[in-house]
C-alpha cells in the first residue's frame, strides 16, 4: 500500500512538472512604476507566450516585477536569451544571448543587486570571441 502511494505521488509530480506554464494574459504595464498588472493588481505568477503555436517566452513575475528565470525564443524555437531577475526586478547572475542559429552571442554577468559585473564576452556569428568588457 505504501509503495502505491509513493508511486502515485511520483507520477503526479512528473506530469505536473512537465506541463506547460499558463499562457500570459493581456497585461497592463505601468511605465512610470515599471509594474506589470492584471485587473489593476500587480501580477504574480509564471506564464508563457506563444505565437502561431510556437513558444516565444517563459516569464515570471512577483508583485508586478520581472522575477525568476526568463527565457526568450526565436521563431525557429532556438533560445534567444535566458537569465534571471531578483525580487526587485533587476537582472542577476549570468545572462546568455544567442544568435538564431544557436551560436552564443553574448555572456553578461550581474551582481545580486542587479549591477553589471565581471567580464562580459561578445561573440560573432561564427562563435569567435570578438570583445571583452570588464565591469570589475
What kind of region is each of these model predictions?
Residues 1-2:
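N-terminal secretory signal peptides that target proteins for export/translocation
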Residues 5-15:
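Sec-dependent N-terminal signal peptides
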Residues 16-136:
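Glycine/tyrosine- and acidic-biased, solvent-exposed loop/turn segments at the edges of beta-strands
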Amino acid at each position: 500500500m505504501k509503495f502505491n502511494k509513493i508511486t502515485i505521488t511520483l507520477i503526479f509530480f512528473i506530469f505536473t512538472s512537465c506541463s506547460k506554464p499558463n499562457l500570459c494574459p493581456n497585461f497592463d504595464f505601468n511605465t512610470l512604476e515599471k509594474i506589470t498588472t492584471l485587473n489593476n493588481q500587480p501580477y504574480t505568477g509564471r506564464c508563457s507566450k506563444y505565437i502561431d503555436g510556437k513558444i516565444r517566452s517563459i516569464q515570471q513575475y512577483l508583485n508586478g516585477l520581472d522575477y525568476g528565470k526568463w527565457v526568450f525564443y526565436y521563431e525557429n524555437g532556438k533560445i534567444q536569451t535566458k537569465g534571471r531577475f531578483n525580487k526587485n526586478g533587476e537582472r542577476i547572475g549570468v545572462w546568455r544571448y544567442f544568435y538564431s542559429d544557436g551560436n552564443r552571442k553574448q555572456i553578461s554577468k550581474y551582481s545580486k543587486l542587479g549591477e553589471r559585473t565581471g567580464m562580459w564576452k561578445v561573440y560573432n556569428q561564427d562563435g569567435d570571441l570578438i570583445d571583452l568588457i570588464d565591469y570589475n
